[in-house]
Amino acid sequence: MSRTRFFQLLRYFHVVNNQDLPDANSNREKLFKICPVLSALQSSLKTLPPEEYQAVDEQIIPFKGRSSLKQYVRNKPHNWGYKSFMRAGASGTMHDFQIYVGKNTCSDRGLGLSGDIVLALTETLPEKQHFKVFADSLFSSIPLAIALKERGIEFCGTIRIDRMGKCPLKTEVELRKTGCGSCD
C-alpha cells in the first residue's frame, strides 16, 4: 500500500463518533478518541492465562508529534513519546497496560502514583495463588510490598533509600568504611 493510500484510509478511520463528543469544557478523558480501542485491547489481554512470574515496568511509545500526553524520559532508547506502564509475563507476553495521562492515571490508593499503578495492574491476578511480581526502583516501596502480600502476591524490587521510612540503616559512607562485603 502506498503512503498516499494509507493516509487516505487513515483520514476516514474514526473510533468515536465525532457528533457525540463531550464538550471541550467538560471533564473528559484525554484519551477519549481511542478509548474504545484501548479497552478492547485490554479486555483481550486479560483473557490470557497469567504466568507465575510477572514484571511491571514503564515503556515509551515513540511519538514525535504534538500532544499534551507526550513525555520526556531520559536514558531510554526513545526519549520522547507516550509513557505507558505494563505488566508482562516471563515469556514477554503483555497481560495489562495503562497509558500515563497525568495525576489521574489510576485511582488513589495512598501508595503514590507508582505504587497505585502496580496495584492497578495486578488487580486481575487471582489472589492467594503466590504470583511473583518484579519491579524496579521506580515502583518499589515497603507499603506496596505489604499491600501485595495481603493479597497473596509476592513482590521483589529494589527499594530506594528515600522510601525506607524510619528504618535505621547505616549511610553509604559508613558502609564504605567497613569494607567490601559488609552489610547492615
PLM regions and their residue ranges:
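N-terminal initiation segments
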Residues: 1-154, 158-163
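An anionic, glycine-rich sequence signature occurring as long contiguous blocks
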Residues: 165-184
